[in-house]
C-alpha cells in the first residue's frame, strides 16, 4: 500500500511533461556505468589499456578531468547516483557490514550500514518512467533486490549482488544471469548478452524516449581473461586478464553506440559514461593519484566521466570543473525537461550549464561521509601510494574538497589532513600545521555540513580494540 501511495503521488506530480531544453523532441538518455574502472584505466588518460569506443565518446563530447564518485565503493556510489542524494540521506555507506576488518584493530563501533536504499527513496528511473520514458536496466544493480521495483520496465541481470555471480561467461551456474543460458551458446560473455539485449530494446523503442542504464559488472573481480583480447597484453607490463576485460567492456559499449548510429538515434541521445569508484589498487595502479577503490584519497574517488550530446556539447572539449556522480540525477531531469524545483532535496546540480556554456554553474564544495571500516587488501608495493595502513582501505571519517584544498577528518583520533591538490595531487604532504587558518575554516564547514545532513558520527569505543 505504501508503495502504491508513493507511485500515485509521483505520477500526480510528474503528470505534466515539460518540453526538452530546446523545445523539441525529448532526448533519450544512455547512462553507462562501469564497475571499479579507475581514472587511469581508459586509453584517453593512459596508454596501458585500449578503449577506442570510450575514446570515441571523448572525441565527440566533453571530458571532465576532475570528476568524482560520490563514494569509494560500489553500493554507496550507485545509491547516490540513482537517488541524487549523499550517503547520510539514504544510509548506504559501504558494501555489506560496516565493521569489516579485524575487530581488534577497530577503535570505534561503526555506524550500522543499510545494504539497500529505503523503499520510499525514489530513483531517477522512477521519475523518468512516470514522465513517459521507457526504461531498461542492464547489469549490476546492487541497491535493492530488483530494479523493476525502482522504476525500470525491463531488467537484464540486475539484483542486489555486488559481484558477477556465476562468472562472466555462460553457462551461468547461479545468479540472475542463469535464465539466459538457453538463449546464448556456451562461452558467451556477459558484455555480449547485455549488448544484444540493449540492441533489441533500442529497436523496439526507437520511437519512444528511453532511459537506458547500462551498468556493467566489468571490471569487478573475479578477473577472467577474455580470449579474444588477452594475448595482445601479455608482456606489456599490465595485468593482461584485467586489460582484456576492459577492452571487452569497451567493445560492448561500441555495439550500443553503433546501434544508435544505425537507428538514427545518435543526435537525440544524451550519453554519460562513468565508473562507480576508483580502480582496485592491487590490480591497476592509479598513480599519480593515491590509493584506489575503498579509499577517499584521490585514487579511490577520481573517476572518468565523459558526456556526449550532439549539437549541444562541443566535440573533444575538456572541462576541469570538479563534478560528482551526484550531479547526474539533476542533469538527467534537466535534459528531459522535468522541473526539479519541487523534487526531493538533491545534493548535486545540473551539468547542463557546463556542457552547453549557457547559464551559471554555482561554485560549491564536495563532501564525502563514511562512518565505517573497510578492510585493506594487504601490503602495497609502494606504501606512500596506498592508504594509511595495510589493515584498512579507510577508517571512519569525512572528507571535503574546497577549491584546491582537500581536508580529511578521521573520527578515531580526530586527525586532520589538509592537501593542496594543485601542488600535490598524490596527497603526500599534510599542510595542517603550516596552514592552521585554512584548516580551521574548512574543518568548521565540514562539521556544519555534517550537522545539516544529520550525518551520524561513531563515538562508542569498541571493547575488542587492542592498540598496537
Where are the language model's segments positioned?
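Repetitive helical segments and hydrophobic/amphipathic motifs
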Residues: 11-12
Amino acid at each position: 500500500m505504501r508503495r502504491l501511495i508513493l507511485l500515485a503521488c509521483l505520477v500526480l506530480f510528474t503528470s505534466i511533461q515539460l518540453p526538452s531544453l530546446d523545445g523539441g523532441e525529448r532526448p533519450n538518455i544512455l547512462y553507462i556505468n562501469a564497475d571499479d574502472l579507475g581514472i587511469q584505466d581508459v586509453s584517453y588518460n593512459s596508454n596501458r589499456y585500449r578503449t577506442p569506443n570510450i575514446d570515441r565518446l571523448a572525441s565527440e563530447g566533453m571530458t571532465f578531468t576532475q570528476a568524482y564518485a560520490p563514494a569509494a565503493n560500489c553500493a554507496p556510489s550507485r545509491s547516490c547516483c540513482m537517488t541524487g542524494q549523499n550517503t547520510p540521506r539514504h544510509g548506504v555507506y559501504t558494501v555489506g557490514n560496516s565493521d569489516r576488518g579485524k575487530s581488534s584493530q577497530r577503535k570505534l563501533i561503526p555506524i550500522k550500514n543499510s545494504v539497500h536504499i529505503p523503499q520510499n527513496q525514489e530513483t531517477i528511473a522512477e521519475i523518468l518512467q512516470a514522465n513517459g520514458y521507457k526504461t531498461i536496466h542492464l547489469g549490476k544493480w546492487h541497491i535493492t533486490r530488483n530494479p523493476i521495483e525502482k522504476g525500470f520496465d525491463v531488467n537484464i541481470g540486475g539484483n542486489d549482488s555486488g559481484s558477477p555471480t556465476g562468472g562472466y561467461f555462460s553457462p551461468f551456474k547461479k545468479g540472475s544471469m542463469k535464465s539466459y543460458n538457453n538463449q546464448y551458446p556456451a562461452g558467451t560473455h556477459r558484455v555480449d548478452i547485455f549488448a544484444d539485449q540493449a540492441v533489441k530494446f533500442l529497436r523496439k523503442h526507437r520511437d519512444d524516449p528511453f532511459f537506458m542504464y547500462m551498468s556493467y559488472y566489468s571490471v569487478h573481480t573475479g578477473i577472467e581473461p577474455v580470449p579474444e583480447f588477452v594475448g595482445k597484453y601479455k608482456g606489456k607490463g599490465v595485468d593482461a586478464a584485467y586489460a582484456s576485460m576492459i577492452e571487452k567492456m569497451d567493445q560492448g559499449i561500441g555495439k550500443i553506440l553503433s546501434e544508435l548510429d544505425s537507428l538514427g538515434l545518435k543526435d537525440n541521445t544524451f550519453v554519460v559514461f562513468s565508473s562507480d569508484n576508483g580502480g582496485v589498487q592491487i590490480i591497476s595502479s592509479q598513480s599519480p593519484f593515491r590509493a584506489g577503490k575503498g579509499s577517499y584519497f584521490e585514487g579511490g574517488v577520481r573517476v572518468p566521466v565523459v558526456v556526449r550530446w550532439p549539437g549541444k556539447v562541443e566535440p573533444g572539449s575538456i572541462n576541469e570543473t570538479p563534478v560528482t556522480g551526484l550531479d547526474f540525477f539533476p542533469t538527467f531531469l534537466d535534459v528531459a525537461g522535468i522541473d526539479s524545483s519541487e523534487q526531493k532535496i538533491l545534493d548535486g546540480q545540473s551539468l547542463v550549464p557546463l556542457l552547453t556554456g549557457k547559464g551559471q554553474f554555482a561554485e560549491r564544495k564536495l563532501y564525502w561521509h563514511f562512518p565505517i571500516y573497510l578492510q585493506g587488501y594487504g601490503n602495497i608495493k609502494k606504501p606512500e601510494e596506498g592508504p594509511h595502513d595495510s589493515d584498512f582501505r579507510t577508517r571512519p571519517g569525512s572528507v571535503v574538497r574546497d577549491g584546491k584544498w582537500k581536508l580529511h577528518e578521521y573520527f578515531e583520533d580526530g586527525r586532520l589532513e589538509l592537501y593542496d591538490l594543485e601542488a600535490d595531487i598524490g596527497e603526500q604532504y599534510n599542510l595542517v600545521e603550516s596552514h592552521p587558518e585554512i584548516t580551521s575554516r574548512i574543518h568548521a564547514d565540514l562539521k556544519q555540513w555534517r550537522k545539516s545532513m544529520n550525518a551520524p558520527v561513531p563515538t562508542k569505543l569498541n571493547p575488542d580494540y587492542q592498540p598496537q
